[in-house]
């Protein structure tokens, strides 16, 4: 069965973005450190690089290694949309959970106006690669019962406030660390599976 994997960058205090959705405050380290980190993550998960950026990092023809589907909330979709990219991950099946986004925004993007849990349960039954939950926190909170794995890129910064990684009801859910890697730019990536 396919897995739902929440792959996301997080501050030390658990935020994925600032109060206005900003994420440009994440420290990258010096040029060499940032390049080494990005190369490592892009080699492992090339499909998580937006289609418009793939050529610039040498991933134009890179195959999808882990995911063939991306699921995101409107807050995660909006930055690309505002920049004119209506299909930010054209190399993946794209679903945007939103009650306000027009269903005809892009023919390659399926807008899901309700019940993301039912969607994920149906997608998991299909054949294919895993499903990447791109964000945001509200959607992750709603989908917590179906999240099988977490890949948390922990950055050495405290935001103070913003959009939490999970924004939902109190629901303690246990995960087990399966791998952890630290990079020279002080980012730590931890892989978790549901217990």
Name each model-derived stretch.
Residues 1-195:
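Enzymes that bind and transform nitrogen-containing heteroaromatic metabolites
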